[in-house]
Amino acid sequence: MEKSIESISSSTLNILDNKNYKKWDNETVCKWLLNNIKTIQKVSIEIFQANEIIGKDLEFLTDKILLKMGVGIRDILNFKFEYQILKNCYNNNNNNNHITINNFNYNFNNFKININKDLLKVVVNAPIININEYQYIETISKNKFCEIEKYKKSQTKVNEYIIIKKIIKNSTLNEEKLINEIDTIYLLDHPNLIKIIGYCKDKNYFYIGMKYYETFKFKQSNISKFGKNFEQVIRKISFKILSAIDYLHSLEPPIIHGNINAKNILLDNENNEPILIDFGLSYKSIDLLTNQKTQFISPCFITPEYFYKKTKNKISKEADIFSFGSTISNMIKGGTDFKEDEEGFEELKRTFAGVLTSRDKVSFDYRSLFTEINKDEPCFRPSSKELLKSFWFVEPPQPSFKTSEITTNLLIYYLKKYGCYIIRDGVAMVSLNFNENIYSTSSIIGSEFSHQPKINEKHKYFKEINQFYSKILSESFQAKIGWYLLNLNNEFKDKPYFKNIFLSFSTSDKLEINSVADLNLKLTIFFYNSITMSLIYQTIYQKPKSFKIVDYL
């Protein structure tokens, strides 16, 4: 058999000539390449045998390494299966030194491979468990695709429980994909994700063993025992679950959970940690041409894009985020099930609208967070990484100092980091970031102007403009920057010249108005973005102690 055809790149030669074996992680393979410069792009078992290269020496030869060694993408595609075969054969061989080649038949030009399938057993890290060592206790749940059962290890004095997920074998199940999925999840390393112990199979089922965790039911009776601290408890649970979701979404390729709800959050009593369960293993291993993967999505949290746009795909990062936000609200409400139809979807909307209006029960920061998560358009929902930075999750310890210690620099720091919420009657009207230009000019605005702003009282819409201003200030009007709250009603009352500025600009030719609807839109933008923020900046600069430390709830 021919041993060489093409040369490797000059950069690779430099590495090999310098014998920088640590960079390639394997001295044996590098020595072989030094002696056989032209053998990298087509190899055979005989070549590896002749150079005493065994299976474990091949484990580091990933696509990334091969690309660095000068192998082109086309060549990688042509022989990547051959490398996998060689690695699997050596790894599965007891001696790792002897292997037959009678069952291999190569055709590189046509990219055809005929091999003995017995040599291609998938090598996985997840161990094989003996189901006979465990005693069946009870069935926790079941559907037409799988069953979840509780088992106890036999012949032990201590009660050692595990969960067995039995996946039914059928014509649509791709067993190789399922085993790969098991191995992928077995290798996941996050304290808030369920741990796979191992697996086994028989002619009817795949058995997947997982650590047993207690179920914490988010019912109103359980939530109420925390009293006024219930939101903090749920926030801590939610943050840890979100970190697990972010871990899954950050993998390459990402893992989409697809089934986030309170029922899939368990409790590890040993570490008092929430555990996210039931991701993968339910839809990834099923043929994508079937609709079985959708059967595992909880009808509790149908996404708006699925309900309104009738999209067939319920599985996405954005859908996970929507379900996560819905799960938090569902926990706060004490747990509710919803039907997968129009009536159930409308009930879901009413329930979560109730969360947003329960101002005596949930914090403003959560209501603001949920509003962002609950966007109808998936592209407008925050990512898991963005959520982890939100104030509701990462708020610093509540300040222990007095209001007299609030300074301009402190408020500017929080403003730059978290932005400013303009709150009207308990509802966030707008969230604004720090604006250097407005801040630098706000300090000079005041009654000491040499002339008062000119107001055109004969303006066509002067009455409506004046009513707009009065209506806003007739309701509770606040600004929130981190932990600090400013009563805007009082500030506008103390600074009447801001009203004059508002009326002057609104009745000038600078604000082109074509209709009453157009008037309200432009007045709203101008009032919140310019007038209100100017007043806030001036207060930060001149009277920072006007801000008060607000309680969490």
From Swiss-Prot:
SUPFAM superfamilies named in the record: Protein kinase-like (PK-like) (SSF56112), SAM/Pointed domain (SSF47769)
Pfam families associated with the record: Pkinase
Molecular function per GO: ATP binding; protein serine/threonine kinase activity
Q: What are the alphabetically sorted keywords of the record?
A: ATP-binding, Nucleotide-binding
Q: Which residues form the SAM domain?
A: 24-90
- Keyword Nucleotide-binding present in the record's keywords: the answer is yes
Sites where the protein binds ATP: 140-148, 165
The keyword Nucleotide-binding is annotated on this UniProt entry: yes
Q: Which InterPro entries match?
A: Kinase-like_dom_sf, PAK3-like, Prot_kinase_dom, SAM, SAM/pointed_sf
Biological processes per GO annotation: signal transduction
Matches recorded under PROSITE patterns: PROTEIN_KINASE_DOM, SAM_DOMAIN
Domain Protein kinase as annotated: residue spans: 134-393
Protein family: Belongs to the protein kinase superfamily. Ser/Thr protein kinase family.
Report the PANTHER family cross-referenced here. SERINE/THREONINE-PROTEIN KINASE SAMKA-RELATED-RELATED, SERINE_THREONINE-PROTEIN KINASE SAMKA-RELATED
This protein's domain notes: The protein kinase domain is predicted to be catalytically inactive.
Official protein name in the record: Probable inactive serine/threonine-protein kinase samkD
Upper lineage is: Eukaryota, Amoebozoa, Evosea, Eumycetozoa, Dictyostelia
